[in-house]
């Protein structure tokens, strides 16, 4: 799994802060989201962020009726096998407990993790939702083709 470019890595904290600040503007619209069907969702944070940074989205998903969980791997310190393996362990645990496929929601680098996990564990994953993830969009390597 290849990580984001150095430019994207360096600008991630700033981009995350901007995203969080726009949440305040979006709050009135969020009440129009229809209720979920109760399936499990695992949320994966972006680079240099931890599960604490995903609490707002997990709380929102829970309020909408989903079973939202954290990735439980601490701070996302980049592309590392131990973080990937740990996230897969949590995914397997959620699947075993619920008997349902799990949706993966990843913010920035977390979206790259989510996509890679889904590619390697498709029998456990319902869908992937990536938020601001730095995917390549040129030619056959485009995210729509992987």
Please provide the spans of the model-predicted regions.
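Flexible, membrane-associating and regulatory peripheral segments of lipid-active enzymes
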Residues: 1-41, 51-54, 59, 64, ...
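Serine-dependent carboxylesterase/thioesterase catalytic core
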Residues: 39-52, 56, 62-146
């Amino acid at each position: 799994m290849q990580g984001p470019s150095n430019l994207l890595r360096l600008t991630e904290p700033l981009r995350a802060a901007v995203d969080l600040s726009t949440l305040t503007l979006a709050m009135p619209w969020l009440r129009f989201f229809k209720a979920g069907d109760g399936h499990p969702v695992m949320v994966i944070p972006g680079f240099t962020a931890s599960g604490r940074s995903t609490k707002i989205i997990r709380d929102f998903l829970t309020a909408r009726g989903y079973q939202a969980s954290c990735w439980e791997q601490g701070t996302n310190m980049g592309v590392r096998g131990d973080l990937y393996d740990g996230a897969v362990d949590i995914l397997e645990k959620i699947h075993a407990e619920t008997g349902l496929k799990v949706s993966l929601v990843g913010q920035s680098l977390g979206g790259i993790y989510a996509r890679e996990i889904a590619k390697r564990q498709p029998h456990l994953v319902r869908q992937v939702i990536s938020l601001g993830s730095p995917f390549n969009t040129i030619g056959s390597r485009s995210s729509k083709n992987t």
